[in-house]
Amino acid sequence: MSLLNILNIAGSAMSAQSEKINVIASNLANAESIVCKDGKFYPYIAKKVIFKLDPLKNSLIGGVKVFSIINDLNPMKLIYDPSNPLSNKNGYVLQTNVNPVSETINHISASRSYQANVEVLKTAKSMIMKTLSIGE
């Protein structure tokens, strides 16, 4: 594997983790939001990022890319709040499935992964510079 492949792989990982951090930020920002669909109001549905292998040519290894962004399948919460204008006839309001604790943990994980790939890039750059200085 060439050093340039290392740069491509680490760069793709940074890009993918950056997208994941953006989705997490959107989830947290919209945790209290509602969506109007077909004349009805619904709570915001959390999103999740799905990654997939982005293989190098003629290789079993590669970088990573965002395959898709899907709706989180965790159930919505029902909260008893009969004074809420969005409550049903029994007084329950459907609340978002955004879990701030899980989102924070996922944010820390994605940030650490991003930082680790920055270090990989720094190491690869250092190796390239040392390789270039061999001929001096």
Curated annotation (Swiss-Prot):
InterPro entries in the record: Flag_bb_rod_N (IPR001444), Flagellar_basal_body_rod_CS (IPR019776), Flg_bb/hook_C_dom (IPR010930), FlgC (IPR006299)
Listed GO biological process terms: bacterial-type flagellum-dependent swarming motility
Domain of life from the UniProt record: Bacteria
Entry keyword set: Bacterial flagellum
Pfam families (alphabetical): Flg_bb_rod (PF00460), Flg_bbr_C (PF06429)
Primary residence: other
A Gene Ontology term for the protein's cellular component: bacterial-type flagellum basal body, rod
Cellular localisation: Bacterial flagellum basal body
Subunit structure: The basal body constitutes a major portion of the flagellar organelle and consists of four rings (L,P,S, and M) mounted on a central rod. The rod consists of about 26 subunits of FlgG in the distal portion, and FlgB, FlgC and FlgF are thought to build up the proximal portion of the rod with about 6 subunits each.
Family affiliation: Belongs to the flagella basal body rod proteins family.
Listed name of the protein: Flagellar basal-body rod protein FlgC
Source organism: Buchnera aphidicola subsp. Schizaphis graminum (strain Sg)
Organism ancestry: Bacteria, Pseudomonadati, Pseudomonadota, Gammaproteobacteria, Enterobacterales
